[in-house]
Amino acid sequence: MAEFLFDRMGCAKCGFVGSLLIIVISSFFFNPSLSAHPITQDAGKPGVVLMCLSAHPDDEDGATIAYYTRIRHIKTYETFYTRGEGGQNVIGPELYRELGEIRSEETLAAAKILGGKAYFLGFLDFGYSKTAKETFRMWGGNDNVLQRIVYMIRALQPDVIITNHDTITTLPYRQHGNHQVVGITAYEAFTKAADPTYHPEQFGNGVGPWQVKKLYFRVLRKSELDQDSLVTIPVNMKYHGKTIQQIAWKALKQHRTQGMDKLNFSDLPEVFPQPVYKLILSDRKYPYNPNDLFSGIKPSVRPSGTLPEKYAVALKPFSIFVHPKYSLLKAEGTSHDEFHFKIDTYNHTGSPLYVAAFVNHGRQRVFDEHEELSRAIRDSIVLSVEVPSSSAAADSLVFTCVPLDAKKMPGLGRSTDVARLRRVTAGFDRKDYIGLVGTYDNTLEQTFDEFGVKYQLLDSAMLASGKLNKYTTIVLDIRGYLYRRDLVRYDKRILDYIRNGGNVVCFYNRPPEWNGHLYAPYPIEITEHRVTEETQPVTVLEPENQLFHYPNEILPVDWDGWVQERNIYLPSGDTTLTSSRYHRLLAMSDEDQHEPSTSLLWARYGRGTYIYTSLALYRQVKDLNNGGVKLLFNLISQPRH
């Protein structure tokens, strides 16, 4: 088994809409003088520069960055390939582009604490990827990725590049596919950035060939610590009364959407051991210093250059995101449908804004108002629109907000988002009365409200009372055993409910909050395994099970159109870890892999039934995928016994 020095490198980035598009980005290089922002170097003073390359927000080596900025006063750039928009959000319902906005804010807050300057390359975090091959394909090809990081190196002119990632592409030590691409392109860019024949169209305005002096990869496994010439960063040194580890800890806690704010001070030694680096490439032989990445590198004067706006500006001055992204078209036969929306606004101007907000349905404007937004970064506009009923299976509304004083603020302009209207042919048992143990995601609440499913949110008092028999099904939402400590406390009430004839549907949890406890009727051991290719075929192993028949017939077409991934955090297939009492109902795997058939488990317990699913069902239901909604309704419509 792979032995890692710290757990954070193994954190899973959840995915994005892989089946809807393949990101093929044409060459982004244009006249560097257009929309260019200056890169301020040290005003003619000799110096050295550090660059840290990371696939996603929170992948940066905060301790090393803080050491070199705070103790050594070295200019440091943090370059992120993505904004992490494909991940999970453990504090709210925001996903995809809006999650990327929030994670960018978190990253900038962390960089401010560390003392670095953050840049984003703009590649899409499309979800957890197992291979560099897939990541390169989704990011437009090897050269499209390489040329972009080469440009950043040429513009920012680092002497030393570090990364927590590497070039290993095979099991058992390979990282996330996005991480692999960072390592591979860092290695290749070391040479290409200095090659005057490689993409010479990048040159101009202070940007030209640049030779990096040293490239280091972080040592992540204890078995590699016995190598010669490793560099250990002395992060136990203090800056203004705090150790470098404490500064890095404070910065990491800014990544709230990834749950990092829950880190305890006692976790410090485990999360931030002394960073150890291995020299991968250098442009010449330098004297060795076991505590300094810059050993032997002489300070030099750098000319100030420019960066295109898309890389220099981490956050747009103004952006909007509409909720919900998908709304239900009502049954045919009505003349109009009414829809309710909330527009989340992100205002980074520091001033109140007056905006013209309007909504178009095709060529028809169905909403047009002026709204005042506060100076707060986040505000919202709540509105209702009425549109003629459509016979189409899908439709859309375009939301636009235009700041009325945009001319007074450079870079401030309109922002647009789209909401889709979909028709869904899924039924549920009208006798259903659902007890919902909610968490940070509101997808199930919105879905039940939209379809008219009768439900009640279960709070601590309701769980403690044990008076649960009035519910036909109790649903435990995603990561319930992390988010709801009362669920942990009163789990016996849930088991009693099943034993007395109830039906429980438990959505996925992660190993840290689940393993080592017996929350389910029979043992389930959760792993980090998943099926990330959402188009992979699904095999129904027990086609006679009523979960596939009542109240909806689950057909092969119902597995089409899924987004991001098939499943996540699969239970172990080993029957000594995940009991054989559970029926394995579905089989699916990524190409050339063999994942356990544990994405949908079903078992009888006493007079009731228990369902555990690691399917990424909430993403499908949020998008009103017809098959996803049908399966959800089947799970919750199983009768009490």
Identify the residue ranges that each predicted region occupies.
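Metal-dependent de-N-acetylase/amidase catalytic core
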Residues: 6, 34-51, 131-138, 142-308
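Long beta-sheet-rich domains in secretory-pathway and surface-associated proteins
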Residues: 309-428
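Aromatic-Pro/Gly-enriched surface loop or interdomain linker
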Residues: 402-477, 508-510, 530-533, 619, ...
